[in-house]
Amino acid sequence: MAELDKDLIGKEFVHFKGGHYRLVGYAKDSETLEPMCVYEALYGEGGLWVRPAKMFFEDVEKPGYSGPRFKVVEG
């Protein structure tokens, strides 16, 4: 697995659409070994989600928004 920043585990992130999440940790896809982010929703009923790390940390280009998909919540 590529080096992923372990200091980000436990941090709160905000999705560009507004939801808040906590990064629980990193995992590997069992078939492809692709690095994945495991994260928990901090709203509603919560729940765990998995997304490829490349996608979690990428910038997105959407109508009205250009920037990171998830940003660390500072403070």
Predicted regions and their residues:
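Mixed-charge, low-complexity intrinsically disordered regions
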Residues: M1-G75
